[in-house]
């Protein structure tokens, strides 16, 4: 048990991604149509979706820039680090 706890703590620190960003995209239960962004852990990019306006989860950002900042996504336009 202690081994698993240590493993997950090390894995979390080594990947350095906000846990909210790993949540699945959730449109929520209501029927509004708010354009939002979520972090897609498969593509490792922030992608657009339509949010229903209530419930959902924390992987829900008003702008793509906010999503990229919180989830650590580098913009394709930013220079690469050496």
Curated annotation (Swiss-Prot):
GO terms for cellular component: extracellular space; nematocyst. It is found in: Secreted; Nematocyst. CDD domains: Kunitz_actitoxin-like. SUPFAM superfamilies: BPTI-like (SSF57362). InterPro entries: Kunitz_BPTI, Kunitz_BPTI_sf, Prtase_inh_Kunz-CS, TFPI/VKTCI-like. PANTHER family: BPTI_KUNITZ INHIBITOR DOMAIN-CONTAINING PROTEIN, KUNITZ-TYPE PROTEASE INHIBITOR-RELATED. This is U-actitoxin-Avd3k.
């Amino acid at each position: 048990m202690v081994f698993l706890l240590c493993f997950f703590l090390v894995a979390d620190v080594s990947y350095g991604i906000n846990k909210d960003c790993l949540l699945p995209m959730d449109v929520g239960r209501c029927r509004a149509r708010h354009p939002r962004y979520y972090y897609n852990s498969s593509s490792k990019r922030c992608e657009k979706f339509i949010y229903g306006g209530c419930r959902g989860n924390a992987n829900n950002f008003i702008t793509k820039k906010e999503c990229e900042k919180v989830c650590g996504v580098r913009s394709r336009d930013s220079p690469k680090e050496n």
